[in-house]
Amino acid sequence: MNESVRSTTPSVIIIGTGFGGLCMAIQLRNAGIETFTLLEKASGVGGTWRDNTYPGAACDVQSHLYSFSFEPKHDWSRKFGLQPEILDYMQHCVEKYDLAGHIQFNNEVASAVFNEATNTWTVTTTDG
């Protein structure tokens, strides 16, 4: 691998921008790691909360428990938050922790193959 490729290759690839992906990205930032990329197959963040927009879609866990411990939300409008409010919270986290520049939207992972000899992963997207 030449130096120019190595310098632009992320040291961490996070698949998806649901709660798990966003949390990992924020924790990497908190640890001082900036060489990460989130690959998101859709055009926006949110995972299940982006995809499930049916009437009445809501959390089945009390809202005050449904936020990151390091970014609590105390002003939920309901005991069990509705999908739009949860998605807004996730977007708030993307903005507050400046993650947008690390996200590649419309970029679906096709495969991830580990090479034991080099201790590296090769991640391929549907676009190549």
Question: What positions do the PLM features span?
Answer:
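Feature captures the FAD/FMN-dependent oxidoreductase FAD-binding
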Residues: 78-128
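FAD-dinucleotide binding site
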Residues: 8, 35-37, 51-52, 61-62, ...
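Glycine-rich active-site loop/strand segments that organize a redox cofactor
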Residues: 50-92
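Short, solvent-exposed loop/turn segments at secondary-structure junctions
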Residues: 20, 43-44, 110
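A short, basic/flexible loop-to-alpha-helix module at the beginning of a structural domain
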Residues: 1-10
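N-terminal FAD cofactor-binding segment of flavoenzymes
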Residues: 27-65
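N-terminal Rossmann-like FAD-binding beta1-loop-alpha1 element of flavoenzymes
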Residues: 10-38
